């Protein structure tokens, strides 16, 4: 029987009735006949809703609960003119399909990706192994990987005195399908929570509906607004891989608990079994010499107290490169092919709140060397997954823990190991300024007493278009408008000083005040390299306010400026108004 014959039979059989009506989304499709033939062969139904065409869900004769998490795979790089009649025969070769969802565009073509859910988890794993890079058309390969089935929401703005039971009760009142609420104690005060929680739902659809209902402006909890977004989903690690893990993840530690204390506590069952401990704020990773020792310590110490805090101990989760790269892309609101990640191997805990991303969440005032690992930007647009098909978290902070405060990369803590801290040089001894910028900036105060009150303010310097020009001309623009004109009575002395510039004077007194250019500023720290050019100070002429002090006399002199006497090469010690001198342009801060 051909596809046309089956269509005619289905529509003409009077005993079938209204059930033979062509489903919406199939009627008028370019391959309508092929889709109807597929439905007749397999007995699956097909319906289009929310921008996706769903095949099955459940399959004919299905009895029992919905398949567990991990049974779904993501299929990408699908040619836009390939539909279920070509996809189903390929994917049913590795197991029984529970449901196939093909994302559709308004023009009737697919959007390049689909989700295939199998009845059992091992069938999904087999699909990833055998069908990834499957050639669906000549030269067109499919991309198949495990689907990130996100059933977890992040909820911020929770009163810090609320307990887990109170939060669970309140969330269950306004949303459906709540399975669990994960709440973490504050690092500083274990009696308080951290102002946020993670809510797990029975399905992704239930989580999506809850997120829509809890969006800001629609509902309030405890009398004020809350922040709601997708949390990063739990990473699913292969069971065979987990059987080799011998690293424990320990959380809910006290801030003051030391690595040595943790090592003694976890090594008490078998002395010498702990290789090393890495503690980060209030969580830690404990490395064991064998898996047996790790499991034994976990079973005996989970739920016990250490220095007054109840410990939570689990096995750390290793992440492969491809999977970790996909999760990083998902955290930025995108998808696509996986790329290699240099920081491997690494371990992450599935829901670790003990990262710097939590301490300012949902605010963007995140500071520190790992800030780029916390703040995620971007949104799901164009062909991104949306509504019930969304399998990516939103553009929020990361919460997956691990060996770093960012996303579980242990090596990030050691990238700068042994590297000396960069430090700027001081113009004024013992001057302390809080570091607020990677470039060291310290002020120097100078004065020109002969200016008078008529020059009480500086003219604004025009902003140059090139940074180097700005460095060269900044001080010139500031000093030139207030430069003191030379006294005619001293013109002869100035001319004599200029004539004597070709030789090194034998006297220790400086030349006339008005005939002396400012030379490069020197640091007060001995043996510090100095910039050999006049730099930002240009060729402006200013007077010295006082003779050299004992401190200046002991400093290193600039041989090129020796013609100007013992004071040459040092910045004048007083101006009537304070100037903020950008020291990083004068001294090398590396």
Curated annotation (Swiss-Prot):
A molecular function (GO) term: enzyme binding
Domain RRM: 71-149, 151-233, 246-318
Keywords, ordered alphabetically: Cytoplasm, Methylation, mRNA processing, mRNA splicing, Nucleus, Repeat, RNA-binding
Residue numbers bearing the Asymmetric dimethylarginine modification: 396, 407
InterPro entries reported in the protein's UniProt record: HnRNP_R/Q_splicing_fac, Nucleotide-bd_a/b_plait_sf, RBD_domain_sf, RBM47_RRM1, RBM47_RRM2, RBM47_RRM3, RRM_dom
Disulfide topology: none
Annotated Polar residues bias: 1-21
Cellular component aspect of the GO annotation: apolipoprotein B mRNA editing enzyme complex; cytoplasm; nucleus
Subcellular location: Nucleus; Cytoplasm
Omega-N-methylarginine: residues carrying this PTM: 396, 407
Gene Ontology process terms (BP): 3'-UTR-mediated mRNA stabilization; cytidine to uridine editing; hematopoietic progenitor cell differentiation; mRNA processing; positive regulation of interleukin-10 production; positive regulation of type I interferon-mediated signaling pathway; regulation of alternative mRNA splicing, via spliceosome; RNA splicing
Claim: Zinc-finger is one of the keywords in the record: no
Region (Disordered), start-end ranges: 1-26
Domains: entry comment: The RRM domains are required for mRNA stabilization.
Function as written in the Swiss-Prot or TrEMBL entry: Single-stranded RNA-binding protein that functions in a variety of RNA processes, including alternative splicing, RNA stabilization, and RNA editing. Functions as an enzyme-substrate adapter for the cytidine deaminase APOBEC1. With APOBEC1 forms an mRNA editing complex involved into cytidine to uridine editing of a variety of mRNA molecules. Through the binding of their 3'UTR, also stabilizes a variety of mRNAs and regulates the expression of genes such as the interferon alpha/beta receptor and interleukin-10. Also involved in the alternative splicing of several genes including TJP1.
Record's subunit section: Homodimer. Interacts with A1CF. Interacts with APOBEC1; form an mRNA editing complex. Interacts with RBPMS.
UniProt similarity note: Belongs to the RRM RBM47 family.
Protein name: RNA-binding protein 47
